[in-house]
């Protein structure tokens, strides 16, 4: 019997400094505590700010055990039922199934190894695989993958456009992930219908392609995340999205029920 898994999917949102000098950027904060963290820093060699996802490192033996458990879980878990549960219920369910399979497969694991493997089971079954930690990052607005062998890019609220250390290297694996995105959006994608756009349960918008007939580097996807709480006028002013005068003008238009057209 392993000790209880504690996973914080909504860690405290940190205050990030806005630095004019990009070479001074070096911040780290939790995404899925205590397993996944983001490290944003200036790379002197590449002369750019990078977004590095830090996750638990698995030994070769741990990778083999993870693959065995994942293969067995896919045969017995109904994913449609699983994703309808609460986060707490899903964590408990994955935990019980993992312990059952470890026992049936006669595997031995230390407590630390089990925690790391459990994180990847949760990430890959309940979450959105490699990009699940990015979905948990409050500061990320857009996630973009332009095919295999190219880094996933993100748009950050504070540090804007950045390259990540996430790279899909296998066409079939990326195609499978795009299928998963479509399923989570309640849509269908295939060779006959290789384009889709839809919404994830959290409201995030997804656009994706499926085959090399559509895009040269294989399947692609873009996710535009939305905040659960809409921006307030003071926040829009603080972010310099709008000036006080612009908001005052909108206020007058709305108050007198004028017609408004917003593009972009």
Predicted regions, residues:
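P-loop NTP-binding catalytic core
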Residues: 145-259
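A general structural signal for well-ordered secondary-structure junctions
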Residues: 140, 259-260
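N-terminal accessory targeting/assembly segments
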Residues: 1-189, 201
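Hydrophobic anchor at the beta1->P-loop junction of P-loop NTPases
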Residues: 262-264
């Amino acid at each position: 019997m392993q000790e209880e898994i504690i996973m914080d999917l909504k860690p405290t949102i940190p205050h990030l400094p806005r630095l004019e000098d990009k070479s001074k950027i070096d911040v780290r904060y939790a995404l899925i505590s205590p397993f996944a963290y983001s490290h944003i820093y200036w790379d002197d060699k590449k002369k750019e700010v990078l977004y590095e996802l830090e996750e638990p490192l698995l030994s070769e033996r741990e990778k083999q055990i993870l693959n065995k458990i994942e293969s067995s879980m896919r045969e017995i878990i109904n994913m449609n039922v699983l994703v309808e549960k609460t986060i707490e219920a899903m964590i408990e369910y994955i935990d019980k199934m993992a312990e059952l399979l470890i026992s049936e497969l006669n595997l031995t694991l230390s407590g630390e190894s089990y925690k790391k493997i459990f994180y990847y089971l949760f990430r890959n079954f309940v979450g959105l695989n490699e990009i699940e930690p990015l979905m948990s990052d409050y500061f990320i607005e857009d996630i973009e993958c332009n095919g295999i062998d190219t880094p996933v890019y993100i748009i950050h609220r504070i540090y804007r456009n950045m390259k990540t250390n996430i790279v899909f290297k296998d066409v079939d694996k990326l195609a499978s992930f795009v299928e998963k995105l479509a399923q989570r959006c309640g849509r269908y994608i295939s060779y006959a219908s290789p384009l889709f756009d839809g919404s994830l349960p959290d409201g995030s918008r997804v656009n994706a392609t499926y085959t090399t007939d559509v895009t040269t580097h294989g399947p692609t996807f873009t996710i535009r995340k939305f905040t659960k709480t809409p921006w307030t006028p003071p926040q829009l002013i603080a972010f310099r999205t709008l000036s006080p005068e612009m908001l005052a003008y909108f206020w007058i238009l709305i108050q007198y029920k004028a017609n408004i057209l917003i593009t972009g």
